Amino acid sequence: MDIILLERINRLGQIGDIVSVKDGYARNFLLPKGKALRANEANKKFFETQRIKLEARNLECKNEAQKIAERLNGKSFIVVRSAGETGQLYGSVSTRDITDIITMDGFSIERNQIELNHPIKTIGLHPVTLNLHPEVQISVTIHVARSANEAQLQEEAKILTSVEATEIVQEQPLEENIG
């Protein structure tokens, strides 16, 4: 099916491009989400009349994403999870967990904006890419640790492997609450 793109889509094209995609992709995703129009004469004329509005809206969204990116780029977030002695997590850190942590910090991020190449299954520092807009990508660091104390050590030492961090945390005496 030939479609006219109403916004920039990765690996597909820019605003106004006429591209050919599979029928299901167009019918089930691009057309219902308002990201494209069928490429017929009426829609081509409609697009040409609306082109300036669409480009202005895209520029506005891009500027908004860049403002968020300036505040969020390079920031780090702490995730506390239980893990074994080798640093292997009991489970994994998913895009839902990352979305919740970033949202608790006051940012509005959707799960589909997070790009995880592989699930996070070990403690340590993990870079994660956020796609705020098709033209705006940033990187944040996820600190996965067993406790807040261990996360603080990871931030201070950033070079420590998960096993070394484990040894340091185990060597420190536990603070007892004497009431």
UniProtKB/Swiss-Prot annotation:
Keywords recorded for this protein, A-Z: Ribonucleoprotein, Ribosomal protein, RNA-binding, rRNA-binding
Classification via Pfam families: Ribosomal_L9_C (PF03948), Ribosomal_L9_N (PF01281)
PROSITE patterns xrefs: RIBOSOMAL_L9 (PS00651)
CC annotations in GO: ribonucleoprotein complex; ribosome
GO biological process: translation
A Gene Ontology molecular function term of the record: rRNA binding
InterPro entries, per database record: Ribosomal_bL9 (IPR000244), Ribosomal_bL9/RNase_H1_N (IPR009027), Ribosomal_bL9_bac/chp (IPR020594), Ribosomal_bL9_C (IPR020069), Ribosomal_bL9_C_sf (IPR036791), Ribosomal_bL9_N (IPR020070), Ribosomal_bL9_N_sf (IPR036935)
Keyword rRNA-binding carried by entry: yes
UniProt record similarity statement: Belongs to the bacterial ribosomal protein bL9 family.
Purpose: Binds to the 23S rRNA.
The name this protein goes by in its record: Large ribosomal subunit protein bL9
Species annotation: Bartonella bacilliformis (strain ATCC 35685 / KC583 / Herrer 020/F12,63)
Encoding gene per record: rplI
